[in-house]
Amino acid sequence: MEKNEPTQSKYDAALAKYNTQLDDAEIAAQAARIIAEKVPANNTPEVKKFLFNCIDLTTLNSTDSDESVMKFTQKVNKFDEEFPDLKNVAAICVYPNFAEVVKDTLEVEDVKIACVSAGFPSSQTFIEVKVAETAMALMEGADEIDIVISVGKFLAGDYEGMCEEIQELKATCKEHHMKVILETGALKTASNIKKASILSILSLIHI
């Protein structure tokens, strides 16, 4: 009797639809070429103003306190007075325990409140803790949530574990935006970065 062939997981099947075998040197050369060709045309005041308006102004220090975060937020409140020709930043990003401080201090309507969550930055904690932290950040006033993928799970080939965490956290966020950070420095290779990107995107549409 022949042994059954191992069944391919839906995650491996999804990755098989894309070319994920990338050469790091070739990718680096392509990136350098794009930078050389495109930077001069985009090194303009208009582009810089646009990019500034995309910034999440961030304070993630172990020394952060209610007072320091309040002062940090006040700088954003005063930005329009000091720089009337520039659009403000997109968001203020803080740890979840400071979401309420920002909410109570922020006076600018079009600046969002972003919170890192889910065991940021290592993502090494229980999924129950990740969900609870995310839910509490939203309850305290966060508009957006930033998470880091479970890099350890990804590198170990546990794509299911990584993707299910993303799905559960997005379900917690509901209509709120959730940013998935890949931690590319830990992924090392272009192939890993592409695989993690694909899996993260597909997780949000429930592969």
Each model region followed by its residue ranges:
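Conserved anion-binding
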Residues: 134, 144-203
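Glycine-rich, proline-tolerant flexible connector loops at the mouths of alpha/beta enzymes
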Residues: 59-65, 81-101, 118, 122, ...
